[in-house]
Design a protein with these regions (language model features):
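The feature encodes the CheY-like receiver
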Residues: 20, 63, 91
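Acidic, metal-coordinating helix/loop segments flanking the phosphotransfer/catalytic sites
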Residues: 36-55
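Two-component/phosphorelay signaling modules centered on CheY-like receiver
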Residues: 17-35
Length: 128
């Protein structure tokens, strides 16, 4: 289903293939261009190479990254990208730390895929 919303470039960073696939399918059906990364190093390469992303969906806990450090690196490499952090470890410390580092929002897992798709649009138009 293609809508009248802008076509965004979205990076999905999660080590769970099913989550990446579900988000990618929904966002692509809305007309967005999606790139997937299954680990922190792939995410850094994707952000460093090529055209910038409008929105980054970032899992908090990845096997090869140090939690909030990856968020800080992405914010430094791509200050124009809105970052939405996804986490099953939504303690107040994690949420506040992510927001202080520039995350647009922190969302708990599990989540509704269509709600995340709507959040991607809101994050894109929000001031950074």
């Amino acid at each position: 289903m293609v809508t009248n919303s802008p076509r965004l470039r979205v990076l999905i960073v999660d080590d769970e293939p099913l989550i990446r696939w579900s988000l990618a399918e929904t966002l692509e059906q809305s007309g967005h261009a999606v790139v997937e990364a299954g680990d922190g190093q792939s995410a850094i390469r994707s952000v460093s190479d090529g055209e910038p992303f409008d929105v980054v969906l970032l899992d908090y806990r990845l096997p090869d990254s140090n939690d909030l450090n990856l968020l800080a690196t992405i914010r430094k490499l791509a200050p124009g990208s809105a970052v939405i952090m996804m986490t099953a470890f939504g303690t107040p410390e994690v949420m506040m730390g992510a927001l202080k580092l520039g995350a647009y929002q922190v969302i708990p897992k599990p989540f509704e895929i269509h709600e995340v798709a709507a959040l991607v649009l809101r994050a894109h138009v929000a001031p950074r």
